[in-house]
Amino acid sequence: MEGYLNPINIFSEIGRLKKVLLHRPGEELENLTPFIMKKFLFDDIPYLEVARQEHEVFASTLKNNSVEIEYVEDLVSEVLASSVALKDKFISQFILEAEIKTDSTINILKDYFSNLTIDNMVSKMISGIVSKELKNYVSSLDDLVNSASLFIIDPMPNVLFTRDPFASIGNGITINKMSNKVRHRETIFAEYIFKYHPIYKKNVPIWFNRWEESSLEGGDEFVLSKDILVIGISERTEAESVEKLAISLFKNKTSFNTILAFKIPKNRAYMHLDTVFTQIDYSVFTSFTSDDMYFSIYALTYNSSSSKIHVKEEKARLRDVLSFYLGRKIDIIKCAGGDLIHGAREQWNDGANILAIAPGEVIAYSRNHVTNKLFEENGIKVYRIPSSELSRGRGGPRCMSMPLVREDI
């Protein structure tokens, strides 16, 4: 992007958004059934036609605010179109990571993918493949035992949530180790984009890689300033990963000198930190707390002389911890004002999962009307988007977007 030396430039959660990564909802949502949706981390089945309409409103809202949009499927297709050898390598890796065991099935799939246009191939990899789509396919015992019901290759409906497979931090990224097996293949796309795409293969250091043993997901990664990160320890991100990321950032002499680890309960409703906590203005955050939702906070700093990380538990309240490290008074708007009924309802429907597109300007689901009204009463400009279908995947505007470039603040 013109005006930036690096293709990744993220030093805040709220700087004016210039470039973002999305995924267009596709046929993968049509391959969800009541019998398998829990396995694929969905609580209900979205209606694709309406989900697409809602997502287009989201994309249009971004474009109307001068945000450039990249689509993950387009970037991967551009990479694979550059080299037949690279395309073949990608196909082989994708099939391997789909855990196809028998040579006959592997060869059938290689032929099938190779004969599709690149755009259609990427689309089919995301949407999944059932046996009736392949000529000459005969399932082996091993394929049947390791297959999910009808699928030779499982769908990847969570690609919709581009926030999680990788995260932009400073001028670099983390390519994440996903917590759930059904999401592991999503990070292949990030691997190829940042290894081979002409825009992204240079000047983008990788702080954490997808082959790590412990899990890390983008919904738990927050860049509060050029000095401070917040990382959630949650249902999806492990404490070991926070320390690994801290070591990587500190030893590479980045600008980040403090990582605040926010431990939250391991609970489906609070799968990532960004389901209960986001920044919406310079000094304003939104959060959700309840009897079973609370924050334990730890500060990680680096002693360069001993090359060791120092960990300190913070005993103060969330607001006071943020005020201390950011050096200014902080206000926290509780989801639905802390109302026991509306707060729980709106948190479940991503009332705290807000995407800031500029300081004090956010995109939010229209259904969370109590929280949105509170934002506006506190001077926040809210762009409302419809979400009757998108919200069925338990992800809001922040989950559905990965910022690539923000203006520095």
UniProtKB/Swiss-Prot annotation:
One of its GO terms (cellular component) is cytoplasm. Its EC number is 3.5.3.6. Keywords: Arginine metabolism, Cytoplasm, Hydrolase. Its main location: cytoplasm. It catalyses: L-arginine + H2O = L-citrulline + NH4(+). One of its GO terms (molecular function) is arginine deiminase activity. InterPro entries: Arg_deiminase (IPR003876). It is found in: Cytoplasm. The active site is at 399 (amidino-cysteine intermediate). Pathway: Amino-acid degradation; L-arginine degradation via ADI pathway; carbamoyl phosphate from L-arginine: step 1/2. HAMAP family: Arg_deiminase (MF_00242). This is Arginine deiminase. The gene is arcA.
